[in-house]
């Protein structure tokens, strides 16, 4: 009788546990769907962030190229160098931060994928024990809280990085604007210099024409003649400079060859001339050369010797 009284109670407990288990399964399914949605959102946010980072890196690289080109044309100054060094360090720091954030995104995506796999395995291997289900639900909740916290931190870091990129981009734009203005000022100064030089040449030509006036000559002819004279002078100067360079290099080569010959005759083969001259010259020419060089090669030691 007691067994018969206990069996219906167990059946009633099992009947009450079945809907709870079904509710837990449904909750797990909802949690899995929410996790998948969060993962999709994270992937979309990561892709958007990567696109923004690539666009900003491309714009920063283009600005760096423009700045490098403008600096190659503009004379170097300490202020520009300091500003560019600061911006380069800031860009390097931002690139390091972006690399760190990309690594964090990769680790987060891996963790989320592992969570998905674990959830799918847990749904397949759901046990009938409510205690294990409750433990798994609590574990999933803890993991969800951790993932949401990490996502919030990542969003904060992304917002901070975007603000830093915007500030650096604005600074680069300002720098490029100032460099363009500086180039325009330099061009205007060069134009003014050219105008001044032309005015000086015209004044010289006018003075020359006022001092010596040729019959039928005009101011334009005098200016043309002066310009032709200047061009001829420049061409002559270039011609003489070119020939002077060639002459200088030839003299240097001859001096070096003479040095090599002297070294060879002094240290390597001192008897070279004695051996080769009889083969090249006749006896009469050798005698004549000996008579000429004999006074220079003999040593006068009579005054030095003791009496």
Curated annotation (Swiss-Prot):
Disulphide-bridged cysteine pairs: none
Keyword DNA damage: no
Coiled coil spans: 20-212
Membrane topology annotation: Single-pass membrane protein
Family: Belongs to the TMCO5 family.
Native source organism of the sequence: Mus musculus
Primary residence: membrane
Protein transport as UniProt keyword: no
Keyword tags: Coiled coil, Membrane, Transmembrane, Transmembrane helix
Domain of life: Eukaryota
Protein name: Transmembrane and coiled-coil domain-containing protein 5B
Residue spans crossing the bilayer: 246-268
GO cellular component, one term: membrane
Annotated compartments: Membrane
